[in-house]
Amino acid sequence: MSRGATARLFVALDLPADVREQLSRWGRAVAATPGPLPALRVLEPQSLHLTLCFLGSRPVAEIDALAAALERCSQPLGELAVGAPLLLPPRRPRSLAVAIGDPAGTLQSLHGSLLVALSEVSGWEPDRRRLRPHITVARMRSGARGGVEAPALPVPTPQLTFTPDALALYRSWLEPAGARYEEIARCELVPELG
């Protein structure tokens, strides 16, 4: 790659395979149910993740430093819970997601550590809004967007709890069929002792 090459990057929690499968199955059930939602394109299970920081287009030369920053942020996470369905963003929704509960507050702590560490090793300026943890399960087809209210869905969200064990730096490509992700660095989260 040339010296000025860039990559579209984000940091996310990897999800256990069974959680990805159940959420994808739920998304397919919602998409197949007639109702108030427009046409949905359900994401493949391997594409599901919990984004913590979207870095945007960054110089490829920063990737090693960003990966090292992930390692420095490794900390135990408490149990997370799948919550209510969300249409995001609320005013002009483009995606169907599920809220993620963080009763112990460990996800917020990890997010804060990442904001500091990632901005210290790059020119990235973080968005200082509080993290609103969610997992995007489906995208609305472009012709069907706009003005959709969050309906009561006939298919309840799965009652799932999980404890993530890895944090990853991903590269994404925007393609006509949807975003494609490549994991380029991975950090195992330190397990809680006790």
How does the language model describe each region?
Residues 1-194:
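Histidine-dependent nucleotide/RNA phosphoesterase domain, centered on the 2H-phosphoesterase fold
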